[in-house]
Structure formats: structure tokens, C-alpha cells
Amino acid sequence: MFLLTNRLALSNLIKNRKLYYPYTLATILVIAITYIFTSLTLNSHLDDLTGADAIKMVLGLGLGIVALSSGIIVLYANSFVMKNRSKELGLYSVLGLEKRHLFSMILKETMIMGFVTLLLGIGVGALFDKLIYAFLQRIIGEGTGLVSTFQVRTIPIVLVIFACIFSLLVLVNGFRLLRLNPLQLTKDGLKGEKKGRFLVIQTLLGLGTMGYGYYLALSVQNPVTAIISFFLAVLLVILGTYLLFNAGTTVVLQLLKKKKSYYYKPNNMISISNLVFRMKKNAVGLATIAILSSMVLVTLVGAASIYAGKKDYLASAAPHDYTVTGTNVDVTSTQKVMDDFLSQSGNQVNRKTEVTYLYFGIKEQEKNKLTIFSENERKVLPKSVFLVFSQATYKQLTGKDLNLTSNQVSLFTKNKILKDQKSVSINGQNYQIQESLNDFIKGKVPNIFTTIVSDYSYLVVPDMDIFKESIKGTATTQSTYVGVNVKDPTHEAKKNSDLLDKLTDKEMQQLAGQTTGVPGPNLTANSRYDVEGMLNGFVGGTLFIGIFLSIIFMLGTVLVIYYKQISEGYEDRERFVILQKIGLDDLQVKQTIRKQVLTVFFLPLIFAFIHLAFAYHMISLIVRIIGVLNPDLMLVVTIIVCGVFFLAYVLVFVLTSRSYRRIVSM
């Protein structure tokens, strides 16, 4: 019996090769991608790249997601294969094979599949490893080089991950054998789906959960809380999608059946009857396609937007080659650090900016009346942030005079309510808004709050000392900023950055010994070289992961579509043969097939685009934290991604529908 199950395991894989080809290809690809991610994560050459820590962190997180996604894809493909082999397994049982023999046969099939796919997958991964590393270097802005990245410890990690996945396959398939008797196995692949219960309640529940998920996605305004809300919204939308496909589609089909003028036409009757016959199975598959498609779109839109927006973020976060920023320190300390740096480095200055300003958070806002947090009050994330400049500083930055009087201010604001106001009250002090300004600090002074809150304002006051006195006792912070552009910013950039850090630390030690107040003084140094390196590492790594996750999600989408077409093609073949025998011609058969396939497989695409439309606001808030500050750019990226995905989806549809037509026409 041992030799018999060996022969059967091998012959079954050959005989069912049409089912196993896409399954094997998908498994090889996910193994290769997992190998590449593991190899890159362990790659010692990453330390040589700028922003190495950010790249390692992103790749490490990506590896976990890739491993989980790979397991889901393999399990899903296996479920379709085993479903279509139910009749075959039942026949073996009727012919005398016991369940333990069947289990032994399936175990050996899985071992053969595992050995072949792991061998080929690791081989493909190792083959493309150098090329993918060069691609990672390219997208993070480093010089490319095909450096050997082979790590011996990569293979055991990949083997352990997929040993767990294949072991789970064996358990799932074994459980399937245990719970079904031979007669059930022979009929399992052919039986229709039971009509669901409480369909109207499920439909309403689906609409409710999806609607609330959409509401969460649209109502969140804070980028920090958006991440938490995003996961809750995703769970609700996934649940709502499954409920609507499971119950909502059946309710709609039942309503169409009651509409006699529509239903009693050959093409419509056949399509609707086929869908109703197996709606529960269709519902799970279609909802899965919709969710996977949404994942592809959201992942690509987010990753591509982050990558496309990095130049805008760099210009905002690092407007100068070298900067020193101080809080609760006199401007002379900030200037001293920069002067010492320029003296010791020998850099020639092209442009220099020196600014002192205040910033504070708004606790409450009632129309144009604003309340600042008090000095000893426990802080929470503010509703809005204000940066306050004197009119002398404004003239220094813009070259323009405002000529403000004692009760006048000028304002640039992202606050929708304040944009239409002629006056503003800050802690009970009223000011007339003389002029609405453009963003006058962009490219000159970094605003660190743009990635935290979308509601921020720049206030210009006639005299900074008088204004500070008017808000005495509130939680305000004085900041000083000195930034310089040098003649040759690329010359010894790393050495200069280290020197600036060293001088800043030295000045901080002196200030710490002179000051005992709380909060204490703080000085930080930055260089565009460091910021750009960290940004390229994080953004490039994010895009890299986004591309490969999208490949995995797209692979899952294609697999689900293909296996649905193939499995339903075999199920429908006998029914279409009967219809042809009772008078349905080939043209009517093709029209019926086309209509059914169009309805079934473009419905998930419509849902995916709707999901993306409602998730767009939340995605824009989340990527804002990472530095995407240009909404127009993100919109263009989204349109391009949707267009490319639509074309890919149509291509998959065309190829799989041909397979379906070929099967039912046999």
C-alpha cells in the first residue's frame, strides 16, 4: 500500500496538472518573494546605504506581511484544488482506499509539491536576488551595483516559514477527509449551494457595517488617529463586503427573478439561475476578489504617492543644507553653533536665514475665538497649531512691509473657519486681521507640524514682546532657527554633518550647566544630507514593499479569478450541454457566458474602486505623516494606479473567460 500511494501521489499531480500549474506557479513566486525579502533584510551591505536603519525597519515589517500573505495565497489556492478533486478522492474511497491511505497519498503529494516549489522558488529568488538589491538601491537614490547578497541563514528561515504553511495544508486537507464520507466526497464538487438564511437581515447588516466603515474613513481629521481608525474601518468594510456579496447579491437576484419582463428571457434566465444556484460560493470568491483588488489599489496608491511626494517633503523639512534649531534658548546660542561650524568646515555661505518665532497649540476654538493650553495643563494633540512671527521677521523673509498697528495682525491659515474671518480673538485679546497672507515660510523655515496636523496657521504680530505678554501663563515655546546654504553642499557632506552634530552637542552641554528651568533648553542640528538619506531609505523601502505586496495581492486576485472560472466551467459544462440539446444555439451560449462572466467578475472591480474612493481621505492623512503634502500629486498618482490596475484586471478577465468558454464548449 505504501508503494501504491507513492505511485498515486505522483500520477495525481501529473493527471491534475491543469489545476496544479497555476497553484505551483503562485507558490514558486511567493517563495521567491519571501526569499528575496529575507535575504535583503539580512543583507550586511544594507549598512553601507544611507538611511540603513529606516530601510531595515521597513523591510523587517514587510517580511512579516509577505510571509502572512504568502500563507493565505497558498491556502486559498489549495482549497480550490481540493474542491475540484473531491469526486476523485471519493472514487478512490469507494474503490477501497481507507482514509488513512488517502491521507498518506495527500501528504506525499504535498511533500512533492513542497520540495519542487521550494527548490524552484529559492532558485528563482537567488537568481534575481542581486537584481532586486540593485533595484532597491535605485529607488532609494543610491548608486547601483550588483553586490552579492547571498546569506546562508536565509534558506533555513524560508524553509521554516513554508514548512509551517505546508504543514497547515496537510492538516486542513486531512480534516477535510475526516469529516466527509465517500458519498459526500463524490458529490462535493458538484453540489449546489444552500440558500442562505436571514438574507434581508444580512444585507442590512452589511450595508450598516460598510456604511460605518466609510463614515470612519471620511470623518477622521487627525493624521495620527487616522492609522488606528484605518484598521477598524478596514475590518468593517471587509465584513460588510462579505455580507453584501453573500446576502445582498442574492436579494437582488431574487428581485430580478420576480421581474418577469427581465427574467423570462433565455440569456437572463440562465445567467440568474446559475448565479442563484451557487451564490454562497460565488459570494465568498467575489468578495475575496474585491478585497484583494482593494488591497492592491490602496497599497500602490499609498506607496507611489509617498515616493512621488518625497521632493516636496524634502523641500519643506530641509530648506537649507545645514540647520540648527533651538527651543527655549537665546538666538545667540543657535548662531554660535552655526558660526563655529562654518569657521571650522570652511564652507562658503550662499544664503543664510536667522529666525525667532513662537509656537503653541489651540485647545478650543469657537468660530474666531481661540484658547491656548495653559502652562501647567496636561497636553493632548491640539486641534490647531500656530506659529507666530514678528513683522520685522516677516520683512526679513519676504522683503515686504506690513505696517501693522498695535491691534492688527496678518494671517496665513489652513483653518477653514478663520479663512473667512475679519478678526481673531486669542485668549480674550482681540485683533483685526489686516491681510490674509500666502505661505511665506515655505522653503525658508521648516514647519515640523505639517505632518502631524493639517490645521496650522502663521500669525504675524506687530511686536513679539507685547504679544508674549498678552498670552502670559500659556503653553508657548520659543524657537530659534538658523539655516545656511553652502557653495558646494555635496563636498564632504557626511563629515560636515558629523561636525555640526558634535558642535551642537558641545553647546548643549554648556547650556545644560547654566540652566535649571523646566522645560530646559534644547538644540538640534540637521543637514539635508542626513534628512535626504533617511527619507530615501524609508520612502524607497516603502515603495519597494508596496510593489511586492501588490504583486502578491494581484497574484491572489488572479488565482481566485482563474480557479473560479475553471471550477465553474466544469460545473456549468454539463448544464450548457443540456441547454444546447433543448435548442440553445452556440451564439446564445456565448452571449449567456459573456453576460454571466461580465456580471460576476466586474462587480468586485466596481466595489474595489468604491472602497478606494472612500479610503482616499484616510490614505491622504496617513501618508501626510510620512510627508506627502501635495494633494494634487496624490490625485494624479491615484488616477494612474487605477488606470493601470483596470487594464491588468481586464487582461486577466479576457484570459480566464477564454478558459471558461473553452471548458463549457468541450
Per-range role (PLM):
Residues S39-D53, I122-I155, G211-I228, L603-M666:
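Short helix-loop junctions at transmembrane helix boundaries
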Residues Y313-L314, H320-T325, V331-L555:
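Basic-flanked hydrophobic alpha-helices used for secretion and membrane insertion
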Residues T154, F231, L235-Q254, K311-V337, ...:
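Alpha-helical transmembrane segments and their immediate juxtamembrane interface regions
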Residues I112-L256:
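Hydrophobic alpha-helical segments
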Residues L3-L4, R179-E193, Y570-E574, R661-M666:
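Short cytosolic juxtamembrane segments of multi-pass membrane proteins
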